[in-house]
Regions:
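A short glycine-rich, Lys/Arg-flanked "PGG" loop and its adjoining helix->strand segment in the class I
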Residues: 113-128
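Class I SAM-dependent methyltransferase SAM/SAH-binding core
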Residues: 32-34, 40-89
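C-terminal helical/coil "lid" or tail adjacent to the Rossmann-like core of SAM-dependent
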Residues: 2-4, 183-239
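A short SAM/SAH-binding and catalytic strip from SAM-dependent methyltransferases
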Residues: 99-112
């Protein structure tokens, strides 16, 4: 499983939203910007940031628990200041960053409210906290209907891995509890509404196979993949997972 390709795919889902939120949050005038859970660098890499060539004065910081992910991130964002650390215990002084953001992170941290408290703590007064994308798998819809069984199994697997699968629908309330003034929130997309390319579909199946390893037989996976491929070619393949964003100010 090539996780950097997966993260790039996720980054593609939010590209327009990120450009909008960074603009509203004043990225062009920022001095220091932090990504919490930077992973392999799909977001923090210069190519993904708005008009990066015009704002070279902005210092980019990233933090992640995974040493392997950070090693990959250094290849894609060589100019960023990267640190290995925990989102629940950010190793930065109070009021350090103009913008602090995360992307598909809070569902994995175990205590998302504490993570938001930490993001708020390290953000300057009047600075901005952005949660770019948090899914709600409890409202997932799979089409054709025969695929719903596999969707449920994947959701169960995510729970077993420690994911908070319904966090998206609670995102605004978490910002409120953390004392972050909410400026805008909403559903950014229903994943699957646009037709997938074959490469994107194969990437989705790589994730499915990784999530379901040891819980579904190879024969079952092969049968479901064949069924799904037929649906894709008929234009009937669809996975809808409401995904939420929140933008707040300290």
């Amino acid at each position: 499983m090539n996780w950097h390709n997966r993260y790039l795919q996720q980054a593609g889902w939010t590209r327009e939203l990120r450009a909008y939120l960074f603009r509203k949050a004043g990225f062009s005038g920022a001095q220091r910007v932090l990504e919490v859970g930077c992973g392999t660098g799909a977001i923090i890499c210069e190519e993904s940031l708005p008009d990066r060539d015009l704002h070279t004065h902005v210092a980019l910081y990233g933090i992640d628990l995974s040493a392997a992910s950070l090693a990959e991130c250094r290849k894609h964002a060589p100019g960023a200041f990267l640190t290995r650390g925990d989102a629940l215990y950010l190793p930065y002084l109070d009021k350090t960053f103009d913008i602090t953001y995360c992307h598909f992170l809070l569902l994995w941290v175990g205590d998302p409210l504490r993570a938001l408290y930490e993001m708020k703590r390290v953000t300057k007064p009047q600075g901005h906290v952005l949660a770019m994308a948090e899914p709600d798998y409890t409202s997932r819809v799979d089409r054709p209907p025969e695929m719903s069984w596999l969707g449920k199994r994947q959701t169960e697997s995510l729970i077993e891995q420690g994911a908070d699968v319904g966090i998206g629908s609670r995102l605004a309330d978490l910002f409120y509890q953390a004392g972050i003034s909410l400026l805008e929130t909403g559903v950014i997309q229903n994943r699957g509404k646009d037709a997938l390319t074959l490469e994107e579909w194969e990437n989705e199946w790589s994730v499915l196979q990784a999530d379901l390893a040891g819980t579904v037989t190879r024969e079952e996976l092969h049968e479901m993949k064949h069924l799904d491929e037929q649906a894709l070619r008929r234009g009937e393949h669809e996975i809808i997972i409401p995904t939420y964003f929140a933008w707040g100010q300290v």
